[in-house]
């Protein structure tokens, strides 16, 4: 269950940013997570609630923005959606794609007090 580890890292980032900006409380965290990262959102939300207990982010709302997968076909040079690794180009059927979006995992923003 890598969601628990991810939440630990997220809380570390939150603490660093909040301390550096002299914040008292974190109200909301916005995460960007690529569709191809394979994160279970329910497990992530559960882990976040557990990990943030007793921290500056204890009652923070967790908002997850999913970034769809996208790739450039190495054959026809078209930009195509990618729902999973090893998808084929929807234009020419080639399997040689270069991923351009979908593996993101970052804290996009925080609302603090």
From Swiss-Prot:
GO terms for molecular function: nickel cation binding; zinc ion binding. PROSITE patterns: HYPA. Ni(2+) binds at residue 2. Keywords: Metal-binding, Nickel, Zinc. One of its GO terms (biological process) is protein maturation. InterPro entries: Hydgase_Ni_incorp_HypA/HybF_CS (IPR020538), HypA/HybF (IPR000688). It holds the Pfam family HypA. Zn(2+) binds at residues 73, 76, 89, 92. PANTHER family: HYDROGENASE MATURATION FACTOR HYPA (PTHR34535:SF3). Belongs to the HypA/HybF family. Involved in the maturation of [NiFe] hydrogenases. Required for nickel insertion into the metal center of the hydrogenase. This is Hydrogenase maturation factor HypA. The gene is hypA.
